Amino acid sequence: MQEKTGSPVLRNARRIVVKVGSSLVTNEGRGLDADAIGLWCEQLAALVKDGREVIMVSSGAIAEGMKRLGWTARPKAIHELQAAAAVGQMGLAQVYESKLRENGIGSAQVLLTHADLADRERYLNARSTLLALLQLGVVPVINENDTVVNDEIKFGDNDTLGALVANLVEADALVILTDQKGLYTADPRKDPAARFVHEAKAGDAALEAMAGGAGSSIGKGGMITKILAAKRAAGSGASTVIAWGREPQALIRLTQGEAIGTLLVAQTQKIQARKQWMADHLQMRGSVAVDAGAVSKVRDEGKSLLPIGMTRVDGDFSRGDVIAIRDAEGAEIARGLANYSSSEARLICRKASSEFERLLGYTGEPEMVHRTNLVLTR
């Protein structure tokens, strides 16, 4: 970890995903702050006019919906939150459309769910649409489609959504703007010896230990969600900046190469696009546990997973679904596309491929997950 960053990452970035937190676009959670959004839109427009492609992932729909509905306390019932989101999305889209249009730039509203990104065809359709919008010089304003999702299929927070969008469009950089100046070695509110982290490698295990709990009562994500988002975005080669959103002209200064906030640098080697799609699954239909020999073959030697190395099959999945591969302790080591359904996998678990025809009634692939359809996660 470095004390100072002079990295050209943002200066050279042509495609940027910007995530702005609730506290930066609302009046302390009481509706949208149109003036603040206007300042963001001025910067977004300047970046587009400079030849960059920009996507905005913005919170604020529920806060705006609560204001329009006259609610003073955030509801706990999921259907009430969904109702607030539906009402608030109208206002959120209107403000961004108005403020960007004032700066001569078009906007588009895009609402995503995890199901959109988990399904390969819908994933590719979403990617094609976003890339088309960027080529047209339009700024897509993205939020989770809270109206139709529940806790089991939510992204969970917009930090995660920002990282997934960065991977979806293969962005050069992810900028997470928050109400904190960046990452410290400890909570500076509790530890006067806490040092500011200017630069580190995304995915550095020490970062997660540094991150505290939730920072703001308005949004959902604390620093830990931002650290994990940076780790996820790094898979497609996107470096991440976590910066204080109240910093004047933060986006402009970052893209001019100024050191603001914490820079989390991505690994140099990108994950193949299709494997990145598999890695980005937040929920999976099932998993298989494997023995130590299979762990070594898959993780250390880059081999396919054979059914003879499986010890247990969990969940209910179909052929072609993304499943997790876990070691004896239950830790995920990889994930990939299943060549067999869960019911078939249970029949061939611990069996050699020579027995498949007798057990299944047909001769299929010898692998449970072929190495070309497998991505390591640990």
UniProtKB/Swiss-Prot annotation:
Catalytic activity line of the entry: L-glutamate + ATP = L-glutamyl 5-phosphate + ADP
Keyword Kinase tagged: yes
GO CC list: cytosol
Signal peptide: none
Cellular localization per UniProt: Cytoplasm
UniProt keyword annotation of Nucleotide-binding present: yes
Disulfides per UniProt: none
Alphabetized Pfam families for the sequence: AA_kinase, PUA
Chain sites annotated for binding ATP: 19, 178-179
Matches recorded under InterPro entries: AceGlu_kinase-like_sf, Asp/Glu/Uridylate_kinase, G5K_ProB, Glu/AcGlu_kinase, Glu_5kinase, Glu_5kinase/COase_Synthase, Glutamate_5-kinase_CS, PUA
UniProt domain PUA: residue ranges: 285-363
Annotated positions binding substrate: 59, 146, 158
Name of the molecule in the record: Glutamate 5-kinase
